[in-house]
Amino acid sequence: MHNNSKKNIIWQKHSVTRIKREQKNGHKSIVIWFTGLSGSGKSSIANSLEEILFQNNFNTYLLDGDNIRSSLCSDLSFSILDRNENIRRIGEVSKLMIDAGIIVLVSVISPYRNQRKKIRLMLGKINFLEVFVDTPLNICEERDPKKLYQKSRLGKISDLTGIQSLYEIPEKPDLHLDETISLKNNTKKLIHILCDKNIISFPNIDETFLF
């Protein structure tokens, strides 16, 4: 029944295309995928980048892992199967957003290499920018903004990534960020790579990039 139903679904083509939206927006669309441990600084960097892009009239949207878990994926647990489904759903939403001509920032742990590989394949290599926010576990645990590491050490959480659950470090991320350096410098690196890939035009970055 399920397979027969899928045969009756036909993707509808629209006259307003991604290319037309990008031309109107004045920039290309892309997914910037921030991966790293809880407390690594993914959301802070993603938020900083979005703020700069927004201030300069680029169309953006930030998909934060906790926000998605509270809404679209509120029915999912933290089992491996549900973690994979969580990432798949975020990937599908991201795919729609790049078709809308938006620069999509995704801040989510996404601990498994296979997950991230599938998203890259789903979106297409040129549409996916993997950013590894590389912060040592001990620093993440010292920060512990959500008290997750504390709960994990007390046995109140049994599946925290980096403690009981594996985090697979990206082997060849598009950008490797050290979160222990300044937020401004990391944000500037991201602006530079977006310019290098011709996603955006940001003249005189070093002179105008002040915040």
From Swiss-Prot:
The protein's Enzyme Commission number: 2.7.1.25
Residues of the active site: S110
Domain of life of the organism encoding this protein: Bacteria
UniProt binding sites for ATP: G36, L37, S38, G39, S40, G41, K42, S43
Keywords: ATP-binding, Kinase, Nucleotide-binding, Phosphoprotein, Transferase
Pathway the protein contributes to: Sulfur metabolism; hydrogen sulfide biosynthesis; sulfite from sulfate: step 2/3
InterPro entries: APS_kinase, P-loop_NTPase
UniProt cross-references to Pfam families, sorted A to Z: APS_kinase
GO MF entries: adenylylsulfate kinase activity; ATP binding
GO BP field: hydrogen sulfide biosynthetic process; sulfate assimilation
Catalytic activity field: adenosine 5'-phosphosulfate + ATP = 3'-phosphoadenylyl sulfate + ADP + H(+)
Keyword Phosphoprotein assigned: yes
Record's keyword annotation contains Aminoacyl-tRNA synthetase: no
Its biological purpose: Catalyzes the synthesis of activated sulfate.
Similarity-based family: Belongs to the APS kinase family.
Protein name as it appears in the record: Adenylyl-sulfate kinase
Protein species of origin: Buchnera aphidicola subsp. Schizaphis graminum (strain Sg)
Organism phylogeny: Bacteria, Pseudomonadati, Pseudomonadota, Gammaproteobacteria, Enterobacterales
